[in-house]
Amino acid sequence: MVLHPRLARLVIAVSAGLLIGYACVWASVSPISIGRSDFTSTYVGATLFREGHGSQMYDASLQTQLHSQVIAPDHVGNLPFVDAPIAAAIAAPVTLLPLDAAYRVWGIFQLLTLVAAVILAVRSARWPKDNWTVWKVATALAAVAALGSLSMLMEAQWTGVNALGLALAYRDWRAGRLGRGAVWLVLFAGVAKPHLALGLVAFALGWRDRRIVQGAVLGAIGVAAVSVAIVGTGGIAGFVHLVALSSTQFAPSAFVGMYGLIGVILGSGAPGEILWLAGAVAACVIAWLAGAAVRSDRSRLEVGLTVAALATILATPHAYVHDLVLLAPMFVWAMADARVRDAASLGQTRRATVLVLACWLTLSIAELLSLAGGPLAAVLGGPIAAGAVVPEVLIAFAVVAAVVTLRGSRKQGVLPGAPRPRRTHGADLTLTLTEPGSS
C-alpha cells in the first residue's frame, strides 16, 4: 500500500496558504476595481433582463448606457455582455443588490460551484482501494488553489459552472450513464460559455455511442428552447451579432489558447485567424481520437477526458486565465489515476503522483507569470502576455496525454475506431477481438 502522507500534508499546507492569500486579495478589491471587472457585463445583462428588455439585451448602445450608470462616477468603456441568454436569467436576482454587494455574492457563488465540481470529481474518481483520505483532501485543495481560481474570483466569472458540468458528466460516464452525462455537459456549457465545450463535444462524438449523441442533442434542444424563451429569436440574432463584433475588441495575445499563442507570434489579422482555425480543428480531431480510444477501452476514460479538456482550452478563441478552472476536475481524476498507478507499481513509488503535481505546479507558474503586475512585472521586465506562456504548457500536456491515451488503447490490441470486442458463444464468455480486414 502506497501512502506518502508527508507529501499529501505538504500539498494541503501550501494549498491552504494560497487560498487564504486569495481571500485576502479578494477582500481588498476596491469599488473602482469592481466596476472595471468582468462582472459588470453580467450585471448589465442581467439587469436588462430583469427590467423586461430581454429581446434588447444584446443591444450595444443600451448596454453602454446602463454600464455608464452602473459604474458612475468612474468612466471606462463598455465591456459588452456576450454570455448566453440563460446567464442573464440566472444572475438576475443578484442585480437587486448594489454592484459592490452583487459582485461579492456572485464571486462566492462561482467559487462554491467550483468547489462542488472538485468534490464531485473526488467522489467519482477511481482511487486506490486502500488510499488514505488525506490524499483526497490534498487533491481537492490543490485543484481549487490554482491561480485560475483567484482570477475567476477577482472577475466573478462563470467558469465554475462549466467545471461543474464537466464533473457531472465524468461522474455519469464513469458509472455507465452515458446519455445523462452528455446532457449535463451540454446544459452547463450552454448556461454562459458554450465555447468551453469544443474539445469535450468532439471527444463525446468520437466515443460514437448513440446514448451520448442523444443526450447531447437533448441538452442542446433544452438550451436553445430556454434561450429563445428568454430573449426571442431577435435576441438570439443580437447575441450572435454582438459576439462577432466583440471578438475584435480584445488583444489576441491575452488569451490562453492557441489563439493567444498565434496572436503573440503573428498579431491580429487573416493569417493568424487561418492558422488558429487549423490548430483548433487539429485539437478537436485529437479529442475525437481520444473519444474513439475510450470507446475501445473504457479504462482510458480519465486520460482521454484529460485530452478533451486541454483541447477545449486550446481550441476556443476566447479563453482567459480564469477559464483554466475548467481543468480543476481534470486534475482530480489525473491525481486519482496517478495514485492507482503508484499503488500498482513495483516498489510502490510516488513517481506518477509527483509528475501530476509538477504539471499542475507548472501550469500555475505560467498563470502567475501571465497575471504578474507591480513589482513582479518590474522584475520580469514588464508584464507577460498570457498567450506567450500558457498555451505552450497546455500543448505539452495535451501531447503527453494524447500519446498515453492512444498508446494505451493499442496495448489493449484495439486501434481507435476499430470494431468493438465481440463475445463468443462459449460458456466462459471469453472476449475475442475483430481486427479490420479479418475474416
Where in the sequence are the language-model features?
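Central hydrophobic cores of alpha-helical transmembrane segments
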Residues: 185-187, 216-222, 305-310, 350-362
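Repeat-unit-sized solenoid/scaffold elements
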Residues: 119, 123-124, 187, 403-407
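Alpha-helical transmembrane segments of multi-pass membrane proteins
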Residues: 147, 313, 333, 360-363
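Aromatic-enriched
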Residues: 335-439
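Hydrophobic transmembrane alpha-helices
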Residues: 98, 193-196, 330
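Membrane-embedded alpha-helical segments of transport systems
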Residues: 191-195, 222-226, 362-366
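Primarily membrane-embedded glycan-assembly and transfer machineries that use lipid-linked glycans
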Residues: 1-181, 204-324, 328, 337-339, ...
